[in-house]
């Protein structure tokens, strides 16, 4: 089936059908009703654009690179899943690479994707803000879009969580619990995302007289958090309140506590970035903030596709998407 037939069956012009199928409906203000008419015909007839032919005409490969720091992080994998599905619907292939939160790995991943001649790259960077690696593309038309962790906003477009605001909101909720000892567990303080989450926490806690212990793991991996927390427990009692800046860090704490005590204390108040419905089975109060994965993926892909459309190339800058707050553990049953 050809594009002309899709347009005829949907009752729209060939140009409008092309905008919808190639992900440019919003750019050209095609109504949601028209988009649904076209996509209904596409689904009914299992239509797939000829990506090779389109790529040859446009000098493109119809492929997009994605570099994420951790394939075991469910937040990243959910975003990747939405990105892949939406990109495929628009005739693009998503090539996924993992940096393991190592700067050298990330730079190699980027170089390999460039060798594959991808049309654009989406990256959640593990590089500190002052690192010069991405500056070579600062004035280059090649689209690089930052996901979750921002790049230089003067030259790149970034879609991130509202890290500082989300951390402040989460810490404000945690403050309501009558805990005497508080532990803040983060990782990689040199990353902007880590800095912003700590700033949000400190803002919420600035007028609270309770002492907070700050710990930073050398990675956002579960094992790194477990090792750090286990060593900390050698000289400190179990905290009564815990704030973790990622779900993997919380898992590391839980691993150590369950191995040592067989269960989590019922009076341990937990606040964490990242969410999982299984937290509802815990017998302690849990506060969790989670990204709106579909919204993040849609916005990122919208920016990527707009970046490939020269007349409508978006300006550099930062888009923040606030997370949702969930009450888990015993809070889900009250």
Swiss-Prot record:
The keyword Transcription applies. Gene3D superfamilies: 3.40.50.2300, lambda repressor-like DNA-binding domains (1.10.260.40). Keywords: Activator, DNA-binding, Repressor, Transcription, Transcription regulation. Residues 3-22 bind DNA. GO terms for molecular function: cis-regulatory region sequence-specific DNA binding; DNA-binding transcription factor activity; identical protein binding; transcription cis-regulatory region binding. GO terms for biological process: regulation of DNA-templated transcription; regulation of DNA-templated transcription initiation; response to fructose. Is displaced from DNA by low concentrations of fructose-1-phosphate. It comes from the Bacteria. InterPro entries: Fruct_sucro_rep, HTH_LacI, Lambda_DNA-bd_dom_sf, Peripla_BP/Lac1_sug-bd_dom, Peripla_BP_I. CDD domains: HTH_LacI, PBP1_FruR. Pfam families: LacI, Peripla_BP_1. Residues 1-58 form the HTH lacI-type domain. PROSITE patterns: HTH_LACI_1, HTH_LACI_2. Homotetramer. Global transcriptional regulator, which plays an important role in the regulation of carbon metabolism. Activates transcription of genes encoding biosynthetic and oxidative enzymes (involved in Krebs cycle, glyoxylate shunt and gluconeogenesis, such as ppsA and fbp). Represses genes involved in sugar catabolism, such as fruB, pfkA, pykF and adhE. Binds asymmetrically to the two half-sites of its operator. NCBIfam families: fruct_sucro_rep, PRK11303.1. PANTHER family: CATABOLITE REPRESSOR_ACTIVATOR, LACI-RELATED TRANSCRIPTIONAL REPRESSOR. Activation of transcription is observed when the Cra operator is upstream of the RNA polymerase binding site. Inhibition of transcription is observed when the operator overlaps or is downstream of the RNA polymerase binding site. This is Catabolite repressor/activator.
């Amino acid at each position: 089936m050809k594009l002309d037939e899709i347009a005829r069956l949907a009752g729209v012009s060939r140009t409008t059908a092309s905008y919808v199928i190639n992900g440019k409906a919003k750019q050209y203000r095609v109504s949601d009703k028209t988009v649904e008419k076209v996509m209904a015909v596409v689904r009914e007839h299992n239509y797939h654009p000829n990506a090779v032919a389109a790529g040859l005409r446009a000098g493109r490969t119809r492929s997009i690179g994605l570099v994420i720091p951790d394939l075991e992080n469910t937040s990243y994998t959910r975003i990747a899943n939405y990105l892949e599905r939406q990109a495929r619907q628009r005739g693009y292939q998503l090539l996924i690479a993992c940096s393991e939160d190592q700067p050298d790995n990330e730079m190699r991943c980027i170089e390999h994707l460039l060798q594959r001649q991808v049309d654009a790259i989406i990256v959640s960077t593990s590089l500190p803000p002052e690192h010069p690696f991405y500056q070579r593309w600062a004035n280059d038309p090649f689209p690089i879009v930052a996901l979750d962790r921002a790049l230089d906003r003067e030259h790149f477009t970034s879609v991130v969580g509202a890290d500082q605001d989300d951390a402040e909101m989460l810490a404000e909720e945690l403050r309501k619990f009558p805990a005497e000892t508080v532990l803040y567990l983060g990782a990689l303080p040199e990353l902007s995302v880590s800095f912003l989450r700590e700033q949000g926490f400190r803002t919420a806690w600035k007028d609270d007289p309770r002492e907070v212990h700050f710990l930073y793991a050398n990675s956002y991996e579960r094992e790194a958090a477990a090792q750090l927390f286990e060593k900390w427990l050698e000289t400190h009692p179990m905290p009564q309140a815990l704030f973790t800046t990622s779900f993997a860090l919380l898992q590391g704490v839980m691993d150590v506590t369950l191995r040592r005590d067989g269960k989590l204390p019922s009076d341990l108040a937990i606040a964490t970035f990242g969410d999982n419905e299984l937290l509802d089975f815990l017998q302690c109060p849990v506060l969790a903030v989670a990204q709106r994965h579909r919204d993040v993926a849609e916005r990122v892909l919208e920016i990527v596709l707009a970046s490939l459309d020269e007349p409508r190339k978006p300006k550099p800058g930062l888009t923040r998407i606030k997370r949702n707050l969930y009450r888990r553990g015993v809070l889900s049953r009250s």
